Regions:
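Hydrophobic transmembrane alpha-helical segments of multi-pass transport and channel proteins
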Residues: 255-263, 290-298
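Interfacial loop-to-transmembrane junctions
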Residues: 274-297
Length: 319
């Protein structure tokens, strides 16, 4: 199993590096879009008993979403050197609302959902917290047509929002995007092995019994070390603000990114646990599905951009 995991991981890492650094951006856009579509399908299948009657609506939101961003993305594809600030200058309300909504969900809502799930409380999207009692979990809200549309919107919003986040990083500086990938990858690997070897204290046993505090510490250390190593090796490719960043800012950025990558992992674990599934799919041998591989990236990428801008390490014209 470990050998299979390693081989699959090496193939995926090679694909990401190839499309991020060496190929034209259109390849990253195309392949990442396919990944997102499969991820949305997996999301729906986790709620299969609730969405079977509405699965034919699967394509509506992606098509509408792509219509909104099609014009500015097409412009960028025709001129790779243009800053993504263009996107926000021409559709400011749409993009700012998308980005800030993503940030609010991952930085505030998702952690609250995880904490309350761990404490066996019922947390719904209207921020009403009550004891579970008759309800199985927050996802019981997904039952019926209204719940299906809630589930439908949330899955598309989180996944396409992540995609847009990665595209912004790519077109501003592909090495900053690779910087993000390396932090999350190293943290995932270190958390897995340190958790298996030293893990004794569970992080959130009701959410994911295999996650431990020792794994979190291992992931944090690896993420911070990777950030410093990446800064050293990519120095000539990163922006001036990144190169001149103080060690404290770099530690903060990498730490927050790792912490919220764990939030993304735990959030998807909640959905899998509610669905009674171990994995979201079977696409990647030894790893599960798309959502199993990008759960950390869904939250980590948002935290990375938000705190990178907040700390003054890069400015994409978002805030």
């Amino acid at each position: 199993m470990l050998k299979t995991r390693i081989i699959t991981a090496l193939i995926l890492v090679s694909l990401v590096i190839l499309t991020t650094i060496f190929l034209e951006p259109v390849w990253f856009l195309f392949i990442s879009s396919l990944f997102v579509l499969v991820g949305i399908w997996e999301w729906f299948k986790l709620f299969s008993s609730r969405v079977d009657g509405y699965i034919h609506y699967f394509w509506i939101f992606p098509v509408v979403f792509m219509c909104f961003i099609g014009q500015p993305i097409s412009f960028v594809l025709s001129n790779y050197s243009i800053s993504t600030v263009y996107l926000f200058e021409h559709s400011p309300v749409f993009y700012v609302v998308i980005y800030l909504s993503l940030a609010f969900f991952w930085l505030v809502i998702a952690p609250l959902m995880i904490i309350n799930y761990q404490k066996k409380l019922f947390f719904n999207p209207y921020l009403v917290i009550t004891d579970l009692k008759g309800k199985r979990s927050w996802s019981d809200l997904m039952i019926g047509p209204e719940g299906t549309w809630m589930n439908f919107f949330l899955g598309n919003f989180l996944l396409w929002g992540m995609w847009l986040n990665l595209v912004i990083l790519l077109f501003n500086n592909p090495y900053i995007l690779l910087f993000l990938f390396l932090i999350i990858w190293s943290a995932d690997i270190a958390a897995y092995f340190s958790g298996k070897k030293y893990g004794k204290h569970t992080l959130a046993d009701n959410v994911s019994p295999s996650k431990t505090w020792e794994g979190v510490i291992g992931g944090l250390i690896a993420g911070i070390l990777t950030a410093f190593l990446a800064l050293h090796f990519f120095r000539e490719f990163l922006g001036v603000d990144m190169i001149q960043a103080s060690p404290i800012k770099l530690i903060l950025l990498s730490s927050v990114t790792v912490i919220y990558s764990i939030v993304g992992d735990l959030f998807i674990s909640i959905i899998k646990r509610d669905a009674g599934k171990k994995d979201t799919g079977i696409l990647f041998p030894g790893h599960g599905g798309i959502l199993d591989r990008i759960d950390s990236l869904m939250a980590g990428s948002v935290a990375f951009m938000f705190w990178g801008i907040f700390l003054g390490l890069f400015d994409f014209g978002l805030l």
